[in-house]
């Protein structure tokens, strides 16, 4: 027996559809209106307003959703397996695949929101562990702080997301990872 009543399932499905549609609409047109988002989702504006009372509440939900997606990607990147550099490449590949979801947030200034930054930092804690592991094994330079490496990674990812239209996903992964790896590879890198 399903514990969620059909109305609840519909509401969750509509919310997910609205978030996905908002990310896509705002990625292609940062000035997209709530009406544009509703149309893209194939829903009426009243449905959108039942979930999000304003553009800001929709953007806040998009920020939360983006961090949740990043959490899922990092968790699914098998961060404890293989070499630290290979684990970092998997993280980069996963985050780059979310580019369209993050682009509107960068353009809207989400990176200035302290709550978003705190949640993003939590999402990247496994990356801190990867870097530390790499430093201990000699794969990653020990003379560069973990904080610097993780901050540089996030900046490179943000640059790739901003250039989304100019780069293929594969090229973005190679540029982000290649640039990072050139600066952090230790003497015992594979």
Question: Which sequence ranges carry the predicted segments?
Answer:
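Alpha-helical DNA-contacting segments of helix-turn-helix folds
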Residues: 52, 59-66
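Hydrophobic/aromatic-rich alpha-helical bundle segments in the mid-to-C-terminal region
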Residues: 106-110, 114-117, 121, 136-180, ...
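Short hydrophobic/aromatic patch on the recognition helix
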Residues: 42-52
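Solvent-exposed, amphipathic alpha-helical segments
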Residues: 21-28, 69-80, 152-163
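Basic, helix-initiating cap at the start of DNA-binding domains
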Residues: 1-28, 32-40, 57-60
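Hydrophobic alpha-helical connector segments
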Residues: 61, 72-100, 112-115
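Amphipathic alpha-helical interaction segments
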Residues: 17, 36, 86-90, 94, ...
């Amino acid at each position: 027996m399903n514990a969620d009543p059909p109305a609840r399932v519909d509401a969750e499905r509509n919310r997910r559809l609205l978030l996905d549609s908002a990310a896509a609409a705002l990625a292609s047109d940062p000035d997209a209106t709530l009406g544009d988002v509703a149309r893209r989702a194939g829903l009426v504006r009243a449905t959108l307003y039942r979930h999000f009372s304003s553009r800001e509440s929709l953007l806040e939900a998009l920020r939360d959703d983006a961090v949740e997606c990043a959490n899922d990607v990092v968790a699914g990147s098998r961060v404890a397996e293989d070499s630290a550099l290979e684990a970092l490449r998997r993280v980069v590949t996963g985050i780059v695949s979310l580019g369209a979801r993050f682009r509107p947030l960068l353009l809207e200034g989400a990176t200035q929101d302290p709550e978003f930054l705190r949640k993003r930092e939590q999402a990247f804690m496994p990356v801190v562990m990867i870097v530390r592991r790499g430093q201990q094994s000699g794969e990653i330079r020990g003379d560069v702080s973990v904080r610097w490496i993780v901050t540089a990674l996030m900046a490179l990812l943000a640059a790739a997301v901003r250039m989304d239209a100019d780069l293929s996903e594969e090229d973005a992964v190679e540029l982000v990872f290649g640039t990072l790896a050139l600066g952090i590879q230790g003497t015992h890198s594979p």
